[in-house]
Amino acid sequence: MEFDLNTEIAEVEEEENDDVGVGVGGGTRIDKGRLGISPSSSSSCSSGSSSSSSSTGSASSIYSELWHACAGPLTCLPKKGNVVVYFPQGHLEQDAMVSYSSPLEIPKFDLNPQIVCRVVNVQLLANKDTDEVYTQVTLLPLQEFSMLNGEGKEVKELGGEEERNGSSSVKRTPHMFCKTLTASDTSTHGGFSVPRRAAEDCFAPLDYKQQRPSQELIAKDLHGVEWKFRHIYRGQPRRHLLTTGWSIFVSQKNLVSGDAVLFLRDEGGELRLGIRRAARPRNGLPDSIIEKNSCSNILSLVANAVSTKSMFHVFYSPRATHAEFVIPYEKYITSIRSPVCIGTRFRMRFEMDDSPERRCAGVVTGVCDLDPYRWPNSKWRCLLVRWDESFVSDHQERVSPWEIDPSVSLPHLSIQSSPRPKRPWAGLLDTTPPGNPITKRGGFLDFEESVRPSKVLQGQENIGSASPSQGFDVMNRRILDFAMQSHANPVLVSSRVKDRFGEFVDATGVNPACSGVMDLDRFPRVLQGQEICSLKSFPQFAGFSPAAAPNPFAYQANKSSYYPLALHGIRSTHVPYQNPYNAGNQSSGPPSRAINFGEETRKFDAQNEGGLPNNVTADLPFKIDMMGKQKGSELNMNASSGCKLFGFSLPVETPASKPQSSSKRICTKVHKQGSQVGRAIDLSRLNGYDDLLMELERLFNMEGLLRDPEKGWRILYTDSENDMMVVGDDPWHDFCNVVWKIHLYTKEEVENANDDNKSCLEQAALMMEASKSSSVSQPDSSPTITRV
């Protein structure tokens, strides 16, 4: 039997006989286990007294909050009376997770891809076998709204109704905590370790005057079943534990390491209990519902309800379905009123394993129907997207317009399938988001560069150019080849720079008068000492500064479909070398030019580098040390000493410190009882407590001893304040941030830590003091021993 956790039970009882009640169209009423409360509570609810009504409302609120906590932070359900849009495609997508029938074999029944309905009832349910939450929404098709296109007075009036009857946010109580179970929590002979703050906030206060403070806790799950636990404060160090009754709960719920347990306490002090499994179900619905709701049955019931203007039921599993298929009408209208274009940057919320909510960014790469033959003009997953982060692509490559949040701070990308007219990139600065290291306004590359690499300077060859654009491409490829080789093997750069640049200068064959790409007034000091040509006729490049690129690969890492930002800087900047000595140069020595290597400017001596011009730099976003560390440091000192303004020296940004000073705590020390030599372990290379236990067993040749609590070993750790705690009580990331040293002790040693006899902890402290007095080595601070 399933349990109804309807949040509006009082409202349902009052409005059951309204014109939008369940009696319309022969719909069925479901009165099974409402709210999942005991029969006495249900009977008191029907009595109609004010006291019972208030208690029922309180129980409804806490159960609703528990249901939403188990469903996840992104679950949003409509309220009774809302106007929504139902998508049969999404409903079939949920059913297809456990159905093996081909979508082409399912008749369409001439249904519209979007059906406007009114919500008659919402029931929050839970699967008794798996504790997975799901909901049953009763919908009534509205024929008068089926042809609305998002414009007109009707929409405005409906928007006001939506504001009055829209879905309200669930009230969140502060007395709630959620913990991911560790291996020790799921052990049959262990207990559930509760964080101190969570225990003090959610559980009743303990009497700490007792030698072993303890109490009995009674918590109800989603089905109204009571679970009794013994809450005790004990151990060395002291901690909150749920002991008696916990192993029974773990075994009956089939909990494993990685599952999450939620505890909530309402205003009356009642405790509620829920679980959220780590493995998402293929379908959280009960088997009885799955058997009756096949793909063909779903569409036939919906088609019959639309034709007869009667109600139909929709079952929705929030943890098994990636997208909701019952959308608020106003949300749908807002999404189609402002159509999404190709190249639109957006953000979308996801529920990740490592965080309850995360916003991921992406770009729209296409707009087309998911199934143009069976569901033409459908808005369901009509957007093809590409994500900035690779792990998001595993979730979905198609989204719906109402799921995304187009941001004005992330402008559009130019994604065109046809060739552009032959003109310079006038809109480059208008299509880059903030933070771009090239333009100082941020952004991504023009998407067209990934599909047309040979059309870099299309049209620019007609502006004062003496050679075709292919010559520029050859020169740019040579710049890229040189930069890539020098970046991969910087040691050989200083010895090969003469030959490589010599070959590059001889092979380019580009007229110096045709390098017009950048405005010298907007790009100062790039051509120091000379101007090859005047580029003031190119105002579209105003403000474009590739020289200011500190890390050009920060925005498109591991994205093979985009050119990195480095390529854009290389392919857009051209440094001719055919005539390195300008006839108009009046200086006795060779002229100087600047080629920016992205992070710093290197000065080249013509005599030391085989006749290369002084101050040669290139717009290559790679850090290439061509002069060696000693000469580079001297040049940096000379450069810093010459920075003055009105006779006053300007502060120069100090270079980053060496890696030795920033990585002083890479490894964590591990000490084992009975071992005089410790070990070091790098926690950053581990993914969780399971990896930590395996690594510790490998270091000390203790295979199978640490992962099994029955073997008699305990793992403790101390933080920077010398407080000793048990490994596994805190989340993994918090543990990695505070751990200072890990200790491996036997069970007997931990239990006898407060005895009069000296423990190995005291012996370790004495050894540390002895080593400190002898000045043999630097001792570690040992934990403080407190005798009771």
Curated annotation (Swiss-Prot):
Expressed in the whole plant. The keyword Transcription regulation applies. It holds the Pfam family B3. GO terms for molecular function: DNA-binding transcription factor activity; transcription cis-regulatory region binding. Residues 38-53 have a biased composition (Low complexity). GO terms for biological process: abaxial cell fate specification; auxin-activated signaling pathway; vegetative phase change. Gene3D superfamilies: 2.30.30.1040, DNA-binding pseudobarrel domain (2.40.330.10), Phosphatidylinositol 3-kinase Catalytic Subunit, Chain A, domain 1 (3.10.20.90). Residues 665-747 form the PB1 domain. InterPro entries: ARF_dom, ARF_plant, B3_DNA-bd, DNA-bd_pseudobarrel_sf, PB1-like. Transmembrane segments: none annotated. One of its GO terms (cellular component) is nucleus. CDD domains: B3_DNA. It comes from the Eukaryota. Auxin response factors (ARFs) are transcriptional factors that bind specifically to the DNA sequence 5'-TGTCTC-3' found in the auxin-responsive promoter elements (AuxREs). Could act as transcriptional activator or repressor. Formation of heterodimers with Aux/IAA proteins may alter their ability to modulate early auxin response genes expression. Interactions between auxin response factors (ARFs) and Aux/IAA proteins occur through their C-terminal dimerization domains III and IV. This is Auxin response factor 4. It comes from Arabidopsis thaliana.
